[in-house]
A protein has these predicted regions:
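Phosphate/pyrophosphate-binding catalytic cores of soluble transferases and nucleic-acid-acting enzymes
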Residues: 1-306
């Protein structure tokens, strides 16, 4: 497949949904490269607890943006966009971007607006007001932006007014500029969303964390905690790390750690699914599980679109 005809495949879904297996199948079929879009799998110390693919899991295929960030760094969506832009510029194998961090996919397709930080006094002024008064003011000052937002969405209404007051420009202006220079602008994009039935997903989640505890997760957390890092860093908040920190401090039993981390993972998966229903409804494929028949359909679609 020539580069100019090469599509970009996006695979999203909640944690433990089987995304990696689908990404591998597509990468094998099209001699592609698998690119990480999971905010925790970027950290070098989080192999087990982030469910990052191991070397055998990678099956000899190129995998990039996995385990390349030290835990002392607060990796951001902006850093991910910068890194992946460099990868795509190399015009290498077909990109198969896979992960559960919805904001990464949104930034790749819609761009990442570089909005100046609002003045703290302006922010404080708007954040103490009601949604009704915020909406009324925004409707008068920036009707187009107001019509895009729910009248009850206090946070977004406040944000729009903070930016308008601080910069003199509509938040929509910044977002339109970002969209014009979005990472995947002008590329052929194929989007696949994978979401198993909830009972199956939760069963997988529970089983997976139990396996993590016996397959190196405890030792991994212990080594991370020895670094003495700020507990507010993203890597320190990875599911399993705070719970195991409590265990090592003598504040939780291992059974409690397991239950708490499983519950936290289920809640995280639920948030991912809620986010996807709002933002990924137009994706070409919505599938419940990876199967041979589904893979054939996806392969044919990629060939036809590619």
């Amino acid at each position: 497949m020539q580069f100019e005809d090469q599509p970009v495949v996006l695979i999203a879904g909640p944690t433990a949904s089987g995304k990696s297996a689908l990404a591998l199948a597509i990468a094998h079929e099209f001699a592609g490269q698998v690119i990480n879009a999971d905010a925790m799998q970027v950290y070098d110390v989080l192999q087990v607890l982030s469910a990052r693919p191991s070397v055998p899991d990678m099956q000899g295929l190129p995998h990039v943006l996995y385990g390349h960030v030290p835990p002392a760094e607060a990796y951001s969506v902006a850093g991910w966009v910068k890194d992946i832009r460099k990868i795509l510029a190399q015009q290498g194998p077909m990109p198969v971007i896979v992960g559960g961090t919805g904001l990464y996919f949104m930034a790749a397709e819609q761009g990442l607006a570089e909005v100046p930080e609002p003045d703290p006094a302006i922010r404080a002024h708007y954040r103490q007001r009601s949604a009704e008064s915020l909406y009324e003011e925004l409707l008068k000052r920036d009707a187009a932006e107001a019509e895009r937002l729910r009248p009850s969405d206090t946070q977004r209404l406040s944000r729009a007014l903070e930016v308008l007051e601080s910069t003199g420009r509509s938040l929509g202006d910044f977002q339109r500029e970002a969209h014009a220079h979005a990472l995947l602008k002008g590329r052929r994009v194929i989007r696949i969303y994978l979401e198993p039935p909830r009972d199956q997903l939760y069963s997988r989640i529970n089983m997976r964390f139990s396996q993590m505890l016996t397959q190196g997760g405890m030792e991994e957390a212990q080594e991370l905690l020895k670094l003495g890092l700020d507990p507010q860093l993203p890597a320190m908040k990875a599911i399993g790390v705070p719970e195991l920190a409590s265990y090592f401090a003598g504040n939780m039993r291992l059974e409690e750690v397991e239950n708490a981390a499983q519950q936290a993972t289920r809640h995280y998966a639920k948030r991912q699914m809620t986010w996807a229903r709002r933002n990924m409804i137009a994706w070409e494929f919505h599938i419940a599980q990876f199967s041979e028949s589904i893979s054939r359909e996806i392969f044919a679609f990629i060939r036809n679109k590619g």
